[in-house]
């Protein structure tokens, strides 16, 4: 412990690592002859997390086991255990196959691209983004809605490989071992049952264009984008070893699956189920290739996505966990924002339940949680920077429902001061 000056200053405690005083930090933890502040503890945790992440990637000759991959996914994604297992096994097998393909073998191992099917806000994109964090391979995400056939206004399919090449710093060898996630894949379904009616440049045409790069071909990729720089030299990228993960909400697919599985009996023996009796995620579990064909995917495209993983609807309990449990949980993010004003933000358990129910009513899944919290905390975040002495803000169920204002607890008072007992 260092001391400066006379009077009260000699009793001031300082962090032994960064030198900040006890008045400059939120917490100062004492040990035998040393002190450490909360900021240094958080910095140490970040260092440890980075080391754990690198040790995961380098384990078992560079191939993380499926359980190790799934364990890291658990830190960020709540639920969806089946989808996490499918992704973990597929990624593990993908790189195991690459590491052993140079060895002599009579059996050639083909790659297994993945199709993720799940309702809006169930975690498809988050699973792919989390994989990018934990794997030391080039990774890129593409939006299928922006893709068109070559020669039409929009992005060429080859632009996906260009983005992967950019993620690999134009290292062709690394890019050829990368992962591509194509989102909104359901939006390129065939627009008509009769393919000869009109030229479908953003639907079936894109599916046809994706076939070759997903199966494996040598793509000629212009470094600066082909349409604006037609005279440049092309880079040759072999897509045989690139793993493709496609995801989509497939709105309406549940009706096709239900119609296929519906009993054809009539009269008193017929079983009549209301649509709301079965949740979308439960119906998706029974998806078959024929259902995807009826939805508008062409047979060749379905054949190149042999692994299908379905995601469940998120119930109230799962949404509450999403709000609080992941490392980057929304509640933790807003609490961190309030900490910057030296204010503690507290959510009552009933308030979290009310937020979850609102998201379910809006049918936005986990994606809608942030907008709900933003609307709840808007007035508070607007007022707080100009208020003095506020120590804690408490959010109750009534606040979420719009019948009350947040509770403000002041440092110089033992009771809770409320801006207004109820909103007008």
Swiss-Prot record:
Keyword annotations from UniProtKB, A to Z: ATP-binding, Chaperone, Metal-binding, Nucleotide-binding, Zinc
List of residues binding ATP: 119-126
GO biological process, one term: proteolysis involved in protein catabolic process
Single Gene Ontology MF annotation: ATP-dependent protein folding chaperone
SS bond list: none
SUPFAM superfamilies (alphabetical): Glucocorticoid receptor-like (DNA-binding domain), P-loop containing nucleoside triphosphate hydrolases
Function: ATP-dependent specificity component of the Clp protease. It directs the protease to specific substrates. Can perform chaperone functions in the absence of ClpP.
Family stated for the protein in its record: Belongs to the ClpX chaperone family.
Protein name, UniProt field: ATP-dependent Clp protease ATP-binding subunit ClpX
Organism: Bradyrhizobium sp. (strain ORS 278)
UniProt lineage: Bacteria, Pseudomonadati, Pseudomonadota, Alphaproteobacteria, Hyphomicrobiales
